[in-house]
From Swiss-Prot:
Function, as annotated: PPIases accelerate the folding of proteins. It catalyzes the cis-trans isomerization of proline imidic peptide bonds in oligopeptides.
UniProt name for this protein: Peptidyl-prolyl cis-trans isomerase B
Signal peptide as annotated in the record: 1-20
Main location: secreted
Activity: how regulated: Cyclosporin A (CsA) inhibits CYPB.
Origin species: Saccharomyces cerevisiae (strain ATCC 204508 / S288c) (Baker's yeast)
EC number per UniProt: 5.2.1.8
Note: Present with 339 molecules/cell in log phase SD medium.
Sequence similarity: Belongs to the cyclophilin-type PPIase family. PPIase B subfamily.
Enzyme class: isomerase
Gene: CPR2
Amino acid sequence: MKFSGLWCWLLLFLSVNVIASDVGELIDQDDEVITQKVFFDIEHGEEKVGRIVIGLYGKVCPKTAKNFYKLSTTTNSKKGFIGSTFHRVIPNFMVQGGDFTDGTGVGGKSIYGDTFPDENFTLKHDRKGRLSMANRGKDTNGSQFFITTTEEASWLDGKHVVFGQVVDGMDVVNYIQHVSRDANDKPLEAVKIAKCGEWTPELSS
């Protein structure tokens, strides 16, 4: 009887650990559930380059995702991304945009005011196409963002909030990272978000 009882406790222990492991996996997966998608139609000078589609992780970073969604879907160039440029590009690292007020990397503002705090650092810069907030230090998120073009950028973890992922059009991002640029990494010819908005399946047809 004692032997049977020991086996019962062992089986119970293993079952609890398996369940906990499964729950952990579900939580990790839930972090990267795409709640909304937006698109950028990119032009380089007079040339139409293509479309970038970005999925937003609104469950893990609802406030940050909402900020980006609103800035991507407004048709007012003074209040969002339409007509703005990628002002900084570094090959094999990232492309940066979102400064719709100044265009140089010193401007931009969030839908909540000039800036808002870091929401969390749950997601990591662990693959190409990560969408993350650019900032001037802790809790200074506005509208500027960057998209990674490297497989891994762990030195950014804990400093920049990851809240989305490129789901289509990474070839366009790769094009942007390799355009000719000046000594300050600004494209010599403007790389512009000519059109942007909410992406729906109908747009793929």
